[in-house]
C-alpha cells in the first residue's frame, strides 16, 4: 500500500469539502478549488478526516492513490493558508517592479519583459531584487514562479539571473590565464 496514500488527511476547521459527480470541491477562507477524480480512487470523509482508497492493486491505481491524496492535501492547505514562492534577482541593473497588473522585469536584455500573471495568482515586489508569487493552487504558484525564473535562469559563472530563495546555484571557476 502507498505510504503516502494510506495516511488520512486531517480536515481543518475552516475548510469544507464535498464530492459531487466525481469532482471534489474544497472551500475555505482563501477561496475554492476543484479537482476531478479518476475512477481508480475513492474518497471518504468521516470524523473530520479524509481518506483516499484505491479500488484495486494495479500499477495505475497505486500511482493515483498517492497522487490524489497529496492533491487533496494541497487543496486543503491552499484554501486555509495558501502557498508562496520567493524569487531573488542577482545582477547589475537587474530589477523587478509591479506596474498595474503587470510585472516589469529589467534583466539585461535590450527590452523590458512584461509578465501578466493569472488572476488566481498574486505577485508582489517587496524590493527591486525580490519577487513573491502567492496563491491557493500549489501547482499554479510553482508554474508561474518557474515561468518568471525562465526569463533569465541563474548562470554558473557570476550567479546572475533569477533564482528561487532556497535554490543553490553551483558556481564554476572561469577560464584561467594561459602560460
Curated annotation (Swiss-Prot):
- What UniProt keywords are attached to this protein's entry? Ribonucleoprotein, Ribosomal protein, RNA-binding, rRNA-binding
Report the coiled-coil segments.
none
Report the record's disulfide bonds: none
Q: Which molecular-function annotations from GO does this UniProt entry contain?
A: rRNA binding; structural constituent of ribosome
Q: Name one GO biological process term.
A: cytoplasmic translation
Source taxon at top rank? Bacteria
Q: What exactly does this protein do?
A: This protein binds to the 23S rRNA, and is important in its secondary structure. It is located near the subunit interface in the base of the L7/L12 stalk, and near the tRNA binding site of the peptidyltransferase center.
Give the PANTHER family listed for this entry.
60S/50S RIBOSOMAL PROTEIN L6/L9, LARGE RIBOSOMAL SUBUNIT PROTEIN UL6M
The record's subunit annotation is: Part of the 50S ribosomal subunit.
The entry's family comment says:
Belongs to the universal ribosomal protein uL6 family.
What protein name is recorded for this chain? Answer: Large ribosomal subunit protein uL6
The source organism is Chlorobium phaeobacteroides (strain BS1)
Taxonomic lineage of the native organism = Bacteria, Pseudomonadati, Chlorobiota, Chlorobiia, Chlorobiales
Amino acid at each position: 500500500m502507498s505510504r503516502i496514500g494510506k495516511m488520512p488527511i486531517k480536515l481543518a476547521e475552516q475548510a469544507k469539502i464535498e464530492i459531487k459527480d466525481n469532482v471534489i470541491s474544497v472551500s475555505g477562507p482563501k477561496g475554492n478549488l476543484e479537482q476531478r477524480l479518476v475512477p481508480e480512487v475513492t474518497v471518504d470523509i468521516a470524523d473530520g478526516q479524509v481518506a483516499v482508497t484505491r479500488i484495486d492493486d494495479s500499477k495505475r491505481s497505486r500511482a493515483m492513490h498517492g497522487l490524489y491524496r497529496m492533491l487533496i492535501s494541497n487543496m486543503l492547505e491552499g484554501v486555509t493558508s495558501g502557498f508562496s514562492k520567493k524569487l531573488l534577482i542577482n545582477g547589475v541593473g537587474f530589477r523587478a517592479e509591479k506596474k498595474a497588473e503587470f510585472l516589469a522585469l529589467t534583466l539585461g536584455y535590450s527590452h523590458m519583459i512584461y509578465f501578466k500573471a493569472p488572476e488566481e495568482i498574486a505577485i508582489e515586489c517587496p524590493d527591486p531584487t525580490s519577487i513573491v508569487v502567492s496563491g491557493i493552487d500549489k501547482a499554479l504558484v510553482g508554474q508561474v514562479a518557474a515561468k518568471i525564473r525562465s526569463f533569465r535562469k541563474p548562470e554558473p559563472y557570476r550567479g546572475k539571473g533569477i533564482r528561487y530563495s532556497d535554490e543553490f546555484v553551483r558556481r564554476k571557476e572561469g577560464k584561467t590565464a594561459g602560460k
